[in-house]
């Protein structure tokens, strides 16, 4: 299991809010995580989680976010089975032990 390192920041208050969460990585993105389906990561919210993933799995953010840094429309992010679109988006707070699932949208016809 990959455990990304924390970015070095000068604001000590930032570190007080960091939580370790489990991130479930879909198969198409596992090439960025050395084949790992689950990663433990440290972040205070979903936006910081995406940045931490990018810092430790270079190139993954371009697959997760559009040019404006917003989650791509065809990917759904869930925190403990709750869609972040109905919470606070990338500002959705994370707590220790939370599970974040990244799920590609499925469509059919």
Swiss-Prot record:
Under Pfam families, the record lists: ThiS
- GO CC entries: molybdopterin adenylyltransferase complex
Q: Which InterPro entries match?
A: Beta-grasp_dom_sf, Mopterin_synth/thiamin_S_b, Sulfur_Carrier/Prot_Modifier, ThiS/MoaD-like
What is one process in the GO biological process aspect for this record? Mo-molybdopterin cofactor biosynthetic process
Transmembrane segments in this chain: where?
none
- Alphabetical list of SUPFAM superfamilies matching this protein: MoaD/ThiS (SSF54285)
What superkingdom heads the lineage? Answer: Bacteria
Family indicated by similarity: Belongs to the sulfur carrier protein CysO family.
Q: By what name is this protein known?
A: Putative sulfur carrier protein slr0821
């Amino acid at each position: 299991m990959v455990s990304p390192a924390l970015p070095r920041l000068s604001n000590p208050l930032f570190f007080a809010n960091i939580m370790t969460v489990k991130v479930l990585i879909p198969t198409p993105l596992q090439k960025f995580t050395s084949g790992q389906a689950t990663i433990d990561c440290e972040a205070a919210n979903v936006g910081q989680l995406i940045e931490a993933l990018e810092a430790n799995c270079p190139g993954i953010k371009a697959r997760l976010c559009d040019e404006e840094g917003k989650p791509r429309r065809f990917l759904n992010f869930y925190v403990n089975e709750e869609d972040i679109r109905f919470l606070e988006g990338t500002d959705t707070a994370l707590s220790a032990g939370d599970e974040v699932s990244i799920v590609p949208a499925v469509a059919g016809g």
